[in-house]
UniProtKB/Swiss-Prot annotation:
Glycans are attached at P34, P36, P38, P40. Contains 4-hydroxyproline; hydroxylated on Pro-34, Pro-36, Pro-38 and Pro-40. It is a lipid-anchor; GPI-anchor. Proteoglycan that seems to be implicated in diverse developmental roles such as differentiation, cell-cell recognition, embryogenesis and programmed cell death. It is found in: Cell membrane. This is Arabinogalactan protein 24. Keywords: Cell membrane, Glycoprotein, GPI-anchor, Hydroxylation, Lipoprotein, Membrane, Proteoglycan, Signal. A lipid is attached at S42 (GPI-anchor amidated serine). Residues 43-69 form a propeptide. Residues 1-25 form the signal peptide. Belongs to the AG-peptide AGP family.
């Protein structure tokens, strides 16, 4: 059971880092694109931020559950 928890945490951390890298790379390309239309934030930015926090929360829960067993 401990091995599965460790593997799950490692996968969650890798997903978090990959998402952060993709968001950082995407934000770096904004200076080449034309100015966005005024209005609310794009949904892709919101979804990326939500995904990062979700993966971080899942990793934290997995760490807590793993440390209690």
């Amino acid at each position: 059971m401990m091995m599965m928890t460790k593997m799950f945490v490692q996968i969650a951390v890798v997903c978090l880092l990959a998402t952060m890298a993709v968001v950082s790379a995407h934000e770096g390309h904004h200076h080449h694109a034309p100015a966005p239309a005024p209005g609310p934030a794009s949904s892709s930015t919101v979804v990326s931020a939500t995904n990062m926090f979700t993966v971080l929360a899942i990793a934290a829960v997995a760490l807590v559950v793993g440390s209690n067993h």
